[in-house]
């Protein structure tokens, strides 16, 4: 409701509010328009915060214009104050908060740099003297958290007031003094306040504490279009929503009878975030009085303040020259050794959180999220977002969603595995292999290999059946549908989060050019069609040339990976005969398993070694392209890293799945590599066991290695840093910024490694799931640990990363969708080619006892093993033996008219395989497309709410502008109009 009578001053006097000096001055005139900036309105509904925010900003401006007003702090009345102002000022009710805000003008025009600059006066004594002399009738008490925050020694400047927003670190012995000096002078010229302080543990280390004052904060918040709250949200319900609410209330009553879900967090333990329940709009200094500013020190969150400071650091020059700009270049050339925002305090407390509450948000995150004892609890996403920023918040939201969706996939995969385990002894194929004591298999190598009884493969046949049974096709279809459902519902979840976190249309508002791009192409400018302003432009010819060079580098690295896989294949061929003649009987009997196991370990070592080179090459190629924005740089770098890692990780698996044992020839005419090494054959029970072994070992070892590098390595480094400090000083005397410096920095590429690890795992879980149904279960167990491991790492082991914003998970969503498509194709080929599902199917309905419905009471796969093995005359091998040996293939026997040629059954199986691939792909793709069509990316209710709020925001803008003009007319004595001018 809008009030059209009285003024702000009279309204505040009626409510008993304080009136600041700045409210007595005449407000700057505005020229409102219906086409002015949206969302910049505030009515009498928040008149208290309105007048307070106006006074905060205007007092800063007035004090900067008249420095002599600082003498108002003395007991005597200043001479330049008029009698009318003196009369009004004498009625003010002074409070500690008002005085603290006013005292910010002290030293505003002063450059804060030297260590001793803030030691010239005792601020607390000054405040106490003033409060004692004036003896205000009432005081605004600070909250417990505010008092602990002000008293903390590691979060403020030496004056005990100015908050530390960013930390720069350098060494005194570094020779880049001129660059640092120029850079720091330019920072002060931009409005930042700096304060130096040496490290306690190492005097050679110097810290520069950076504080961004209110006026500079407002200027850059307006420039960056930072959205801030300006009015509480008002919700509406139509008849349809009312009916829904009745149903929801009914279910709520039922839930009350049931026990509380142990996975749900206790909401009373978390602070309410005011901005999540307010309409927001881009900040504007001209209309600062419209916003809800209860406290200007907390109006912009810590994350926003740090983000604005980093924006300034990245665009400040340190030398003459267009490219000599940015803190990252200064860190690269050694001028500074680190730059980071500080943590909000210690993450542990001697006082229990249940009785004394959290000391700070970091402490709260540790107790309610990062501790291992909270592994079964939901994540406090709003608090994560508030502390680490939206980008990291979205990562943990996606990781939690992915982990939750793995539960049904793991359950179904486990059921398929248990089905194979229960029916393993009933398998007709396994029974025939285990009973084939008189069937001899042809030697699998030319030297040191002898004839082998078929029943020696009994164990391998049973293990193969665990992963290759009747549920394999069903599980492959299920996982393809699961991948689609997971991605579609994540899009809905993401849209809800972007709305809740006020990220709708954020990218168009805040995306800026990279300094490197601006420095490279500053001479070639074009008019931006959106902003209408000139900006640097990269010519198309230059862009295409750089992309061609980058693509060439990518193909070179992929060819290097393929070469490494080929080397492992050669190794398998060389050591195959060596293991067959090994001295140890166990290795000699299981030489194929030993060959595969050793090859897997060597392949894993090669994967880890190549990973070290991939990151540097991808970084070099991405910088060579000169991406326009940070998001483009991240997407390009992430795509290269994914391609390198995906090929590196899966190339050996693709070889085993689709090439191992496919082109070996037949006894007497084997194909050889370089006319020397005979190609490797599959085990008598099939190649699927080799594929399972390869996937299981790589997945298990890689997850252990990643977890160690993510947590174990930082733990060791941080322990060593603390150990060196404890030699000469106590931990209690170390300030927060030095404790943060002793932590490990976050990876320079941000969340890329975290996403890459999970996306590669998603590929393992979906692409070859037909061969390894336990992959979702292993992924689920790993992710339960991964969430708390990452949380513990972010909260306790890493310096606080820059709180960046993002609307989605970036290019990773497109990569996940591509993996989902590739998974359908790959599983179709795995079922059709790698497994024996199609040969069994053809035998069952064409060549077996049940063909043409002749014998319906017998097992339809009876005789399948004998049918799938071909004959070869041993006399042709020159081994001095007679008789026949068997081998896996569909070729004619030696006594046929066309010996060792493919039989008709081979061509039937080949046709069935191709037909299955086509039918499977079309069926699954059709189901995936239908499901994607049924599930909209944005829920209908959310879409309606967004449209409703846009309408309300525009109406509020008109209403508040009218109200502000009426206030102006009341002050000037002009007539009031109750309609829009």
Swiss-Prot record:
Glycoprotein among the record's keywords?
Answer: yes
Q: Which UniProt keywords apply?
A: Cell membrane, Glycoprotein, Lipid transport, Membrane, Transmembrane, Transmembrane helix, Transport
Question: Which membrane topology term applies here?
Answer: Multi-pass membrane protein
Tissue specificity comment = Predominantly expressed in neuronal tissues. Expressed in brain.
Tell me one Pfam family matched here: Anoct_dimer
* Ranges that cross the membrane: 404-424, 470-490, 551-571, 593-613, 641-661, 762-782, 811-831, 915-935
Q: Where is the composition biased (Basic and acidic residues)?
A: 76-87
What's an example GO cellular component term for this entry?
Answer: plasma membrane
Q: Where do Polar residues bias regions lie? A: 1-28
Disulfide-linked positions: none
Which ranges make up the Cytoplasmic topological domains here? 1-403, 491-550, 614-640, 783-810, 936-981
From what superkingdom does this record's organism come? Eukaryota
Subunit-level organization: Interacts with KCNT1/Slack.
Q: What does this protein do?
A: Has calcium-dependent phospholipid scramblase activity; scrambles phosphatidylcholine and galactosylceramide. Does not exhibit calcium-activated chloride channel (CaCC) activity. Seems to act as potassium channel regulator and may inhibit pain signaling; can facilitate KCNT1/Slack channel activity by promoting its full single-channel conductance at very low sodium concentrations and by increasing its sodium sensitivity.
State the family named in the UniProt similarity comment for this chain.
Answer: Belongs to the anoctamin family.
User: Do you know which PANTHER family this protein is assigned to?
Assistant: ANOCTAMIN, ANOCTAMIN-3
Its name, as the record gives it, is: Anoctamin-3
């Amino acid at each position: 409701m809008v009030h059209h009578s009285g003024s702000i001053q009279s309204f505040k006097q009626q409510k008993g509010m304080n009136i600041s000096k700045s409210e007595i001055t005449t407000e700057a005139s505005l020229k409102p328009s219906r086409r002015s900036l949206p969302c910049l309105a505030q009515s009498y509904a928040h008149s208290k915060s309105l007048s307070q925010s106006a006074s905060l900003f205007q007092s800063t401006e007035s004090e900067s214009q008249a420095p002599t007003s600082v003498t108002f702090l003395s007991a005597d009345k200043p001479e330049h104050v008029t009698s009318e102002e003196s009369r009004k000022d004498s009625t003010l009710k002074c409070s500690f908060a008002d005085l603290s805000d006013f005292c910010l003008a002290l030293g505003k025009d002063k450059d804060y740099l030297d260590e001793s600059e803030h030691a010239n006066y005792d601020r607390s004594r000054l405040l106490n003297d003033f409060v004692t002399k004036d003896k205000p009738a009432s005081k605004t008490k600070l909250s417990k958290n505010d008092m602990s925050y002000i008293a903390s020694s590691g979060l403020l400047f030496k004056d005990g007031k100015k908050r530390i927003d960013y930390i720069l670190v350098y060494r005194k012995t570094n020779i880049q003094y001129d660059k640092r000096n120029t850079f720091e002078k330019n920072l002060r010229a931009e409005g930042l306040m700096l304060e130096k302080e040496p490290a306690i543990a190492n005097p050679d280390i110097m810290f520069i504490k950076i504080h961004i004052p209110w006026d500079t904060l407002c200027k850059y918040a307006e420039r960056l279009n930072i959205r801030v709250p300006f009015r509480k949200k008002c919700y509406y319900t139509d008849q349809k929503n009312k009916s829904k609410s009745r149903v929801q209330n009914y279910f709520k009553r039922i839930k009350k009878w049931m026990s509380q879900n142990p996975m749900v967090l206790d909401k009373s333990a978390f602070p309410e975030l005011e901005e999540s329940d307010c309409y927001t709009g881009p900040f504007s200094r001209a209309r600062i009085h419209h916003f809800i500013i209860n406290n200007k020190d907390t109006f912009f969150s810590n994350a926003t303040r740090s983000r604005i400071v980093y924006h300034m650091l990245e665009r400040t020059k340190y030398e003459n020259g267009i490219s000599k700009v940015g803190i990252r270049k200064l860190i690269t050339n050694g001028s500074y050794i680190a730059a980071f925002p500080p943590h909000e305090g210690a993450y542990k407390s001697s006082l229990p959180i249940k009785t004394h509450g959290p000391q700070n948000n970091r402490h709260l995150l540790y107790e309610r999220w990062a501790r291992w004892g909270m592994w079964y609890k939901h994540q406090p996403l709003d608090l994560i977002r508030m502390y680490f920023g939206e980008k990291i918040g979205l990562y943990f939201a996606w990781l939690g969603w992915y982990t939750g969706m793995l539960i049904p996939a793991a359950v179904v995969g486990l059921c398929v595995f248990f089905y194979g385990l229960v029916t393993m002894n009933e398998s007709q194929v396994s029974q025939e292999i285990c009973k084939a004591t008189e069937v001899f298999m042809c030697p699998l190598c030319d030297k040191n290999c002898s004839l082998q009884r078929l029943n020696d493969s009994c164990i391998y046949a049973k293990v193969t059946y665990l992963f290759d049974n009747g549920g394999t096709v069903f599980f492959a279809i299920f996982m393809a549908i699961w991948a689609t459902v997971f991605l579609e519902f994540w899009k809905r979840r993401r849209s809800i989060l972007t709305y809740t976190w006020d990220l709708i249309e954020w990218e168009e508002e805040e995306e800026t050019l990279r300094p490197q791009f601006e420095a490279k192409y500053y001479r070639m400018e074009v008019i931006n069609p959106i902003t209408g302003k000139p900006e640097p432009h990269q010519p198309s010819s230059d862009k295409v040339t750089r992309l061609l060079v980058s693509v060439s580098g990518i193909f070179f690295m992929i060819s290097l990976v393929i070469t490494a896989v080929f080397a492992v294949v050669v190794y398998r061929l060389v050591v195959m005969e060596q293991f067959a003649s090994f001295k140890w009987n166990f290795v000699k009997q299981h030489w194929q398993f030993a060959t595969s196991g050793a090859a897997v370990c060597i392949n894993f070592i090669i994967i880890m070694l190549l990973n070290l080179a991939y990151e540097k090459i991808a970084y070099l190629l991405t910088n060579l392209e000169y991406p326009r924005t940070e998001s483009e740089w991240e997407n390009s770098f992430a795509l290269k890293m994914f391609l390198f890692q995906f090929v590196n990780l899966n190339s050996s698996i693709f070889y085993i799945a689709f090439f191992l044992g496919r082109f070996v020839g037949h006894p007497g005419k084997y194909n050889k590599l370089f006319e020397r090494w005979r190609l490797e054959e599959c085990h008598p029970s099939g190649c699927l066991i080799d594929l399972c072994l390869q996937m299981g070992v790589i997945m298990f070892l890689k997850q252990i290695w990643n977890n160690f590098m993510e947590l174990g390595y930082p733990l060791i480094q941080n322990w060593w840093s603390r150990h060196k400090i404890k030699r000469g000083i106590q931990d209690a005397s170390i300030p927060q910024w030095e404790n943060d410096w002793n932590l490990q920095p976050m990876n320079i590429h941000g969340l890329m490694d975290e996403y890459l690890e999970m996306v590669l795992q998603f590929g393992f879980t979906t692409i070859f799931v037909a061969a390894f149904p336990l992959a979702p279960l292993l992924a689920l167990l790993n992710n339960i640990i991964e969430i708390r491991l990452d949380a513990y790492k972010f909260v306790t082991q890493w310096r606080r990363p820059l709180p960046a914003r993002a609307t989605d998970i970036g290019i990773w969503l497109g990569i996940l969708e591509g993996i989902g498509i590739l998974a359908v194709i790959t599983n179709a080929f795995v079922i059709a080619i790698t497994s024996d599902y199609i040969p069994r199917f053809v035998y069952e309905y064409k060549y077996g006892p049940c063909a043409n419905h002749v014998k319906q009471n017998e097992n339809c796969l009876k005789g399948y093993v004998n049918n799938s093995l071909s004959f070869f005359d041993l006399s042709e091998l020159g081994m001095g033996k007679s008789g026949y040996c068997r081998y896996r293939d569909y070729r004619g026997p030696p006594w046929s008219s066309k010996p060792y040629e493919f039989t008709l059954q081979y061509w039937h199986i080949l046709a069935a395989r191709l037909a299955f691939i086509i039918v499977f792909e079309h069926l699954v793709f059709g189901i995936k497309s239908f499901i994607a069509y049924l599930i909209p990316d944005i829920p209908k209710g959310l879409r309606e709410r967004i449209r409703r709020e846009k309408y309300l925001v525009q109406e509020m803008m008109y209403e508040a502008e009218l109200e502000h003009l009426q206030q102006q007319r009341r002050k000037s004595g002009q007539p009031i109009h109750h309609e829009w001018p």
